[in-house]
Amino acid sequence: MDSKSGRSESAINIPESNSTKHKSTVVHTATKVAAVAPRGGGWRRGVSIFDFILRICALAAALAATATMGTTDQTLPFFTQFFQFQASYDDLPAFTFFVVANGIASGYLVLSLPFSIATIVRPHAAAIKLLLIIFDTVMVAFTAAAAAAAAAIVYLAHNGNSKTNWFAICQQFNDFCQRVSGAVVASFVAAVILIFLVVLSAVAIRKH
């Protein structure tokens, strides 16, 4: 009888209980969630890093526009006993507003850098991104308005207006016109980057 029991092998199948199945399902689900979560955070962190780089570029453009326009001054080498031919940015209110607006935008961009770093550390912080969107939009209005007003004056300086007897001055004040034209271009670049920052933050919040 012992030999028969040794020859035959019996397999005992222990059915898996419902609690064990439930635990294994929970473990698999938690593993999938843990695998997906870093991906979403990594994507948002990448967007935040790109946001930080764009802010530095916008800051450089706004500072260049402010410094270039604020230091623009040219005096012609010839003068009379009563007149000296000079052109300065503060002779025109549009250029003065240009310097003030781009200076404010530069200061804001400097202050926004720590908040941009905070979104890199905490990529799921939607409140910070919403705050940046609001102020970025205000700075877009400032820089775009200043650049547009200055561009109108630069156009008149280059081409004049025969109907109002406004003569083009860029043939005489060549250096002055080149500097103010470069400042206007830099301001438009800053405005475009700020617009892109608003769109980028809005997309990140929408996919939050």
Curated annotation (Swiss-Prot):
CC terms in the record's Gene Ontology section: plasma membrane
Residue numbers on the Cytoplasmic membrane side: 1-46, 118-129, 206-208
Subcellular location: Cell membrane
Disulfide bonds: none
GO BP of this protein: cell wall organization
Topology in membrane: Multi-pass membrane protein
Biased composition (Polar residues): 8-18
Residue ranges of the region described as Disordered: 1-23
Protein's UniProt keywords contain Membrane: yes
Keyword annotations: Cell membrane, Cell wall biogenesis/degradation, Membrane, Transmembrane, Transmembrane helix
Chain's role: Regulates membrane-cell wall junctions and localized cell wall deposition. Required for establishment of the Casparian strip membrane domain (CSD) and the subsequent formation of Casparian strips, a cell wall modification of the root endodermis that determines an apoplastic barrier between the intraorganismal apoplasm and the extraorganismal apoplasm and prevents lateral diffusion.
UniProt record similarity statement: Belongs to the Casparian strip membrane proteins (CASP) family.
Protein name, as recorded: Casparian strip membrane protein 2
